[in-house]
A protein has these predicted regions:
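Generic beta-strand/beta-sheet core signal
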Residues: 1, 54, 83, 112-114, ...
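Conserved catalytic-core segment of nucleotide-activated headgroup transferases in glycan assembly
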Residues: 22-117, 124-126
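Short acidic active-site motifs
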Residues: 119-120, 142
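Catalytic binding pocket for nucleotide-activated donors in carbohydrate/polymer assembly enzymes
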Residues: 125-126, 130, 134-219
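Active-site-proximal region of nucleotide-activated glycan assembly enzymes
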Residues: 1-36
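Short, conserved active-site loop motifs that form the nucleotide-linked donor/cofactor pocket
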Residues: 17, 108-110, 176-177
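C-terminal amphipathic helix plus adjacent low-complexity
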Residues: 45, 55-57, 70-73, 77, ...
């Protein structure tokens, strides 16, 4: 699509890059179950800001975790929820050590267990005020779920495919707030969204409106565009023979 690879990316690929007009993936929404998480269960006061990161463990990079802790430090009335498939002890040690090195109390971290069904996982996302993306390996499915649930997201954009997934998805739902091109912008957006409930509400409204208009939530349209691309590829192949 126009976003997931930079314009100069072709030199790094032996295959010819073929750009679809809007998005390289689309889904017709998600099933959402009944939430099983409440703030009081996690001993989190109702008047605080909750950040969440739900990517799988291999996407966690210490540098990105450090930026997330810097956000927490600048938003004192905040907590950070961490979930995702990973070795529990390793993840807790990673976050706890970096939090302490950045002057953030480990008591503000919560490590969430896995749930029985994906629909429950999505419902539980509603506990978060802001989702913080991973870098240099962004979320993909987790980002789509976040956008579908209408939760503001902060993502750091890089040069490679895996660091531009969330950027492309956000552009396709018409949300630029939270897209960061530098580490500094990532922290700035995280802090700003944590401190501005009105902005969070505006972004959430945009995301929910996008369910009716965005190509990201229109699998039929995407399929037609993909089929058209296949025909164009075949035509070019035949003409070049």
């Amino acid at each position: 699509d126009p976003y997931v690879l930079p314009e100069n990316a072709q030199e790094y690929y032996s295959e010819t890059i073929w750009r679809l007009p809007q998005t390289y993936v689309a889904v017709d929404g998600f099933e959402v179950g009944v939430p099983t998480l409440r703030r009081d269960q996690l001993e989190i006061p109702l008047d605080t800001v909750v950040y969440l990161s739900g990517q799988t463990g291999f996407k966690r990079h210490p540098d990105a975790v450090r930026l997330q802790m810097q956000i927490l430090k600048q938003v004192p009335n905040s907590y950070f929820l961490v979930k995702g498939l990973a070795d529990e002890n390793s993840i807790q040690q990673l976050f706890t050590q970096i939090a302490e090195s950045e002057g953030v109390e480990a008591s503000r971290l919560r490590f969430l267990p896995r749930v029985s069904h994906e629909s429950v996982h999505r419902a539980n996302l509603a506990i978060a005020d802001v989702v913080l993306d991973t870098y240099p390996y962004n979320g993909a499915t987790t980002t789509l779920e976040t956008l579908w649930m209408g939760i503001p997201l902060v993502t750091r954009v890089g040069q490679q495919f895996s660091a531009r997934n969330s950027y492309g998805f956000m552009m396709n739902v018409g949300v630029t707030e939270g897209i960061a091109w530098t580490d500094e912008e990532y922290v700035e957006w995280g802090v700003r969204l944590g401190k501005d409930p009105s902005l969070r509400q505006q972004i959430s409204w945009k995301m929910r409106q996008s369910r009716q208009t965005s190509p990201l939530w229109n699998a039929k349209q995407f399929t037609q565009e993909m089929e058209k691309a296949y025909k164009q590829m075949w035509r070019r192949y035949v003409e070049d023979k």
